[in-house]
Curated annotation (Swiss-Prot):
It is found in: Nucleus; Nucleus speckle; Cytoplasm. Belongs to the DEAD box helicase family. eIF4A subfamily. Transmembrane segments: none annotated. Gene3D superfamilies: P-loop containing nucleotide triphosphate hydrolases. Residues 245-406 form the Helicase C-terminal domain. This is Eukaryotic initiation factor 4A-III. It comes from Salmo salar. Residues 64-234 form the Helicase ATP-binding domain. Keywords: ATP-binding, Cytoplasm, Helicase, Hydrolase, mRNA processing, mRNA splicing, mRNA transport, Nonsense-mediated mRNA decay, Nucleotide-binding, Nucleus, RNA-binding, Spliceosome, Translation regulation, Transport. SUPFAM superfamilies: P-loop containing nucleoside triphosphate hydrolases. CDD domains: DEADc_EIF4AIII_DDX48, SF2_C_DEAD.
Length: 406
């Protein structure tokens, strides 16, 4: 018997068009305009409203019901549109709270993001008595084992530590119904691809897979064929991905050492609200932090080599507004939510164009306004033009009155 295929919005492509591929949302995806009409459990609805959500965002209106139905889902949504809550609500709805075993596994590319997902799950599931553990590198293994032995409904973590816990048999996978890959473009990029496959091999064959990210390059979608079954696609066109409300500028600097002077000139502008400055390497972050402090500027900094405790206290300070300027590597660029950030400076242009949107997506969340300033050396002009073309956007030279735009 022939299996009926799910209708999809058609895409007619010649071979040479493959680089410009744009999926549409699958035709059978309907829009559910309110949380009340999603068929969610009462104690979860209470948690959603207590958390401050009133109306679901565009991605939530489309994806939550599909995930709850048990479909594999590829969801693409801009940074700051509520995609974390999309899968958190879906995961919580699917739990059997009576069974104290791990039923959902969420993988994220950074420790901070995994920690934030855990916080959102616990907040939304506040009235459900949900147990949720964040399983991340750089923390005490014994504590992980103790928490997992106690029983956790949901585990959010980084692939390396999660796989370690599965191998030690501390994280039992037999009851897992759902695997969520957050920031999937980063996760499936070289570094995490093998680790995800390692984890996936231990999951029950019928595990539902949800993949969520702001950018989904074609080669990532190719990989999803390996472990997703007839996935529903909820995608925005790539050209809409540069975030509205974010003004993007560049400052031409002839030499690397001039970047520092330019940054010092901009410091007063930085502290109007809060700012994040991105460098491409940990060494550059340390160097720039030290140089700024020597010049009597107050800055904090964060990168992946710092001990977990230190990273957490730096994030806490920054979230509370106690520190105003944070210098970081791309460890910060993925999904971290600090609403007051309205200025991003790319001290170094990112190494790939997907990262650009993750960085500038930090500012102007949920439609707030934001400004991104790119420091561009002569040999960076080509990369900048490539970013402009890729996102169909315009990056103008920075005006003198940039402070008025923040």
């Amino acid at each position: 018997m022939e299996v009926a295929t799910v209708p999809r919005t058609r895409r007619l492509l010649k071979e040479e068009d493959m680089t410009k591929i744009e999926f549409e949302t699958s035709e059978e995806v309907d829009v559910t305009p309110t949380f009340d009409t999603m068929g969610l459990r009462e104690d979860l609805l209470r948690g959603i409203y207590a958390y401050g959500f009133e109306k679901p965002s565009a991605i939530q209106q489309r994806a939550i019901k599909q995930i709850i139905k048990g479909r594999d889902v590829i969801a693409q949504s801009q940074s700051g549109t509520g995609k974390t809550a999309t899968f958190c609500v879906s995961v919580l709805q699917c739990l059997d709270i009576q069974v104290r075993e791990t039923q959902a596994l969420i993988l994220a590319p950074t420790r901070e993001l995994a920690g934030q997902i855990q916080k959102v799950l616990l907040a939304l599931g506040d009235y459900m008595n949900v147990q949720c553990h964040s399983c991340i590198g750089g923390t005490n293994v014994g504590e992980d084992i103790r928490k997992l032995d106690y029983g956790q409904h949901v585990v959010a973590g980084t692939p390396g530590r999660v796989f370690d816990m599965i191998r030690r048999r501390s994280l039992r996978t037999r009851a897992i119904k759902m695997l969520v890959l957050d920031e999937a473009d980063e996760m499936l990029n070289k570094g995490f691809k093998e680790q995800i496959y390692d984890v996936y091999r231990y999951l029950p064959p019928a595990t539902q897979v949800c993949l969520i990210s702001a950018t989904l390059p074609h080669e990532i979608l190719e990989m999803t064929n390996k472990f997703m079954t007839d996935p529903i696609r909820i995608l925005v066109k790539r050209d809409e991905l540069t975030l509205e409300g974010i003004k993007q500028f560049f400052v031409a600097v002839e030499r690397e050492e001039w970047k520092f002077d330019t940054l010092c000139d901009l410091y007063d502008t930085l502290t109007i609200t809060q700012a994040v400055i991105f460098c491409n390497t940990k060494r550059k972050v340390d160097w720039l932090t030290e140089k700024m402090r020597e010049a009597n500027f107050t800055v904090s900094s964060m990168h992946g080599d710092m001990p977990q405790k230190e990273r957490e206290s730096i994030m806490k300070e920054f979230r509370s507004g106690a520190s105003r300027v944070l210098i970081s590597t791309d460890v910060w660029a993925r999904g971290l939510d600090v609403p007051q950030v309205s200025l991003i400076i790319n001290y170094d242009l990112p190494n790939n164009r997907e990262l650009y949107i993750h960085r500038i997506g930090r500012s102007g969340r949920y439609g707030r306004k934001g400004v991104a300033i790119n420091f561009v050396k002569n040999d960076d002009i080509r990369i900048l033009r490539d970013i402009e073309q890729y996102y169909s956007t315009q990056i103008d030279e920075m005006p003198m009155n940039v402070a008025d735009l923040i």
